[in-house]
Amino acid sequence: MAGFMKNAMSYLGMSDVVDDEDDYIEEDEEQKPASKSAFDSDHTVTPLASTTAPAASSTTKPFPGGRVNRITTIHPKSYEDAQLVGRALRDGVPVVLNLTGVAEAVAYRIVDFSAGVVFGVRGSLERVTPRVFLLSPAQVNIKVEEPTKPASAHDLFAD
């Protein structure tokens, strides 16, 4: 126990540094020199043939490019429906995610999953309303305009 206290006090800077290495002095034993034949050999090393990366598998599809010709609207009923979001974004289709019919805890899980998918495809996620989101893949650019608030109720319908 005294050794522990010495080490603790030394660690906290309350005493001199304990040098435990001096406690265990071993007698120098005669060491046999290693045989030269163990390290030097006449065997030659044959280099391996360089390998190239395997070609892309036939199941891999290139990421779709070009114009977007459809948008998918998803109204999930449970967390299991979140995979529909992942499939659509993987295929390059923008998704409108409407969470109005889902419990709040499930909606948070779906948004979390969807945000991960959007990150994975390098896309973007925009909140349209508190429970409706627009998720778009990388090749789709979304222009977000901040709505201007009317000065008064009379200006609400003014052109």
From Swiss-Prot:
Residues 44-64 have a biased composition (Low complexity). Its main location: cytoplasm. InterPro entries: Cell_div_SepF (IPR023052), Cell_div_SepF/SepF-rel (IPR007561), SepF-like_sf (IPR038594). It is found in: Cytoplasm. Residues 23-69 are annotated as: Disordered. GO terms for biological process: division septum assembly; FtsZ-dependent cytokinesis. Keywords: Cell cycle, Cell division, Cytoplasm, Septation. GO terms for cellular component: cytoplasm. Homodimer. Interacts with FtsZ. HAMAP family: SepF (MF_01197). Belongs to the SepF family. Cell division protein that is part of the divisome complex and is recruited early to the Z-ring. Probably stimulates Z-ring formation, perhaps through the cross-linking of FtsZ protofilaments. Its function overlaps with FtsA. This is Cell division protein SepF. It comes from Bifidobacterium longum (strain NCC 2705).
